[in-house]
Amino acid sequence: MNLYLTLFSFCFLAIMAEAASEIPEKFFGKYDLDRSENFDEFLAAKGVSWFVRQMIKLAKVSKVLAKNETPGKYNMENLTSKKNTLYHGWELGKTFEAEGLDGVAHKITFSFKDGVLSEHHIRLNDPEHSAETYYYTIENDQLVMKMVNNGITCRRWFKRSTGKK
């Protein structure tokens, strides 16, 4: 009887751990940039020139987060008026390589913990100084992205789109 209870407990914990490693449904959808807080200051802290900051701030930005057709895998798309990045078929906690919005190859890892989806990037051409993590939460049916650099915290709010992808 004790063996069955132990086996049941182990299976239950394994199932709960698996369920906790999934992105909740409320995150899935297409989101369009609505507003930003400290975005210019954040870019300046990263050393981005004034002219380039103005170009970046003018860009239309949408994010699409979806389940991939393969169970346990996901897709994230960053759609901008300048360049798109399409990260398809990634798994939580597994690092993959892809091109970032800056045109440079990145190592990227997505994780989900305590209601927060994180997207961690390391540029392959400067791994010692380039680590960045973006944190996503859902607040009032909006996707909220948080970034920090040199003590500057930036937040960007994306409204859920009612249109098709």
Curated annotation (Swiss-Prot):
One of its GO terms (cellular component) is extracellular region. It is found in: Secreted. Keywords: Lipid-binding, Secreted, Signal, Transport. The keyword Chloroplast does not apply. Residues 1-19 form the signal peptide. CDD domains: FABP. Expressed in presumptive hypodermal cells by the comma stage and in posterior body wall muscle cells by the two-fold stage. From L1 to adult stages, expression continues in body wall muscle cells adjacent to the pseudocoelom, while hypodermal expression is extinguished. The keyword Lyase does not apply. Gene3D superfamilies: 2.40.128.20. GO terms for molecular function: lipid binding. It comes from the Eukaryota. Forms a beta-barrel structure that accommodates hydrophobic ligands in its interior. May play a role in sequestering potentially toxic fatty acids and their peroxidation products, or it may be involved in the maintenance of the impermeable lipid layer of the eggshell. PANTHER family: FATTY ACID-BINDING PROTEIN HOMOLOG 1-RELATED-RELATED, FATTY ACID-BINDING PROTEIN HOMOLOG 3. Belongs to the calycin superfamily. Fatty-acid binding protein (FABP) family. This is Fatty acid-binding protein homolog 3. It comes from Caenorhabditis elegans. The lineage of its organism: Eukaryota, Metazoa, Ecdysozoa, Nematoda, Chromadorea.
